[in-house]
A protein has these predicted regions:
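Short, solvent-exposed, Trp/other aromatic-anchored flexible loops in extracytoplasmic proteins
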Residues: 72-150
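N-terminal export/targeting and maturation segments
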Residues: 1-78, 148-164
Length: 164
């Protein structure tokens, strides 16, 4: 993967091709660092502890199908965790304190289908945030949708979250 760089909102939009107006900076005005190697289907996010945003990236190649990765908000004080949907709606999950979870969402035709996203074969994985900095690596697989019909399984070989 390439060298990680601090990027602003416009640069992130150029990388992902998606509207990221809902992306908010943390207290110091910096944005999440992102490095994408689409050819290898690698997605790499680096966030600071005080970042309170969600970032999504489409990894499904079909034009009429988009599968999204949602990065949850982390709250260290009180030990609570929430998953923030693309729409900005908070979807609270019952998770252990100081945990990390990955959520998969489906979206097509510019609208999120919550009914289908609820039925997606989620691979929710929790990790304890024990030490900092830390790196969490895992693989993801999800069922795609084409014209409302389930299609082949889409795999991401590696997704890495690095907290520093």
């Amino acid at each position: 993967m390439g060298v990680l760089e601090q990027i602003d909102q416009k640069e992130l939009l150029a990388l992902t091709g998606k509207n990221v107006e809902w992306l908010k900076p943390h207290s110091e005005g910096k944005y999440i660092s992102v490095s994408l190697d689409v050819s290898d289907e690698f997605i790499h996010y680096v966030i600071d502890n005080d970042v309170n945003v969600s970032v999504v990236y489409s990894f499904c190649e079909q034009e009429d199908t988009q599968l999204w990765i949602g990065l949850p908000n982390l709250y260290y004080a009180g030990g609570t965790l929430t998953d923030k949907l693309i729409s900005g709606e908070l979807n609270k999950k019952n998770v252990d304190s100081y945990g990390l979870k990955l959520a998969l969402f489906s979206q097509w035709d510019g609208k999120q289908d919550k009914a289908y996203s609820e039925s997606l074969p989620y691979h929710f994985t929790s990790y304890n945030l024990i030490s900092e900095p830390m790196s969490v690596c895992f693989s993801i697989q999800a069922v795609g949708m084409v014209n409302g019909t389930k299609s082949e399984v889409v795999k991401i070989p590696k997704t890495e979250f690095v907290f520093k």
